[in-house]
Amino acid sequence: MIGGIDEAGRGPVIGPMVIAIVVGESDDMIKIGVRDSKRLSPGAREAVYEKILRVAACVNYVVIEPAEIDAYVSRGMLNALELKYTAQLINLCPAEYYYVDSPDVNPKRYESGLVFATGKRVIALHKGEAVPQVAAASIVAKVVRDRLIQLLKKEVGDFGSGYPSDPRTLQRLREGRMPSECIRWQWKTVGGRIGLGRNRHESGENPGDSRG
C-alpha cells in the first residue's frame, strides 16, 4: 500500500496549518473521486473526505498552531517544521512507501531529510497531488482546517479567508479584533502592512520554500 502526505494552510496569516497522511490503494482513491482539494468545492471535499475515511487503511493528521509556526518561521525553518510532523505521521501509518508533496524548492533535499528521520522509503515531489494518496491527504488536511476555521469564525466573527491577500482579513487585523493566539505574528503582513509589529516574513518562507 502507498501513503500520501500533504498540507493545508501554510500561507494564511490567521489560523493553524494541518498536515495529513492517507494510506490506501490507488484504485480505491480514484473510484471515490479523489483529486486535488483545490479542484473540489467545499461540499464535494466534505463528501469525498467521508469516503476516504471508509476506504483508506490509515488516515491521520496533525494541527500546528500559529505559535509553533512563528517559532520556526523566526528562524527561517518552516520546512523543518513540516518535516518534523510529516516524519511523525509516516511513523504512525505503515505503508510500502510514501509520496510527499514537497514544500522545498529542492524535493530531493526534503526527501533525504524524511528518509533520515524515518528510515522509510519516501519520494518527495512537486505537484504531488497527481498521486491519488497525496490528493486524498490534501482533501483531509483541507477539510480539517476548514472545520477549525469555521469554529473560529463562530467565536470571533468573519475574517475572510485568513490569507494576506484578502481585504477582509487585513481589515480585521487592522481593527485588532482577532485573538492574538490565532495570528501568525512572524508574517510580514502583520507588521509591514498592518503595523502590529513582530513581523519577519510575507508567508513564512525561507530560501528553500516553494509555497506560500
Curated annotation (Swiss-Prot):
Its main location: cytoplasm. GO terms for biological process: DNA replication, removal of RNA primer; mismatch repair. Coiled coil: none annotated. It is found in: Cytoplasm. Belongs to the RNase HII family. NCBIfam families: ribonuclease HII. Residues 1-199 form the RNase H type-2 domain. This is Ribonuclease HII. It comes from Pyrobaculum aerophilum (strain ATCC 51768 / DSM 7523 / JCM 9630 / CIP 104966 / NBRC 100827 / IM2). HAMAP family: RNase_HII_A (MF_00052_A). Its EC number is 3.1.26.4.
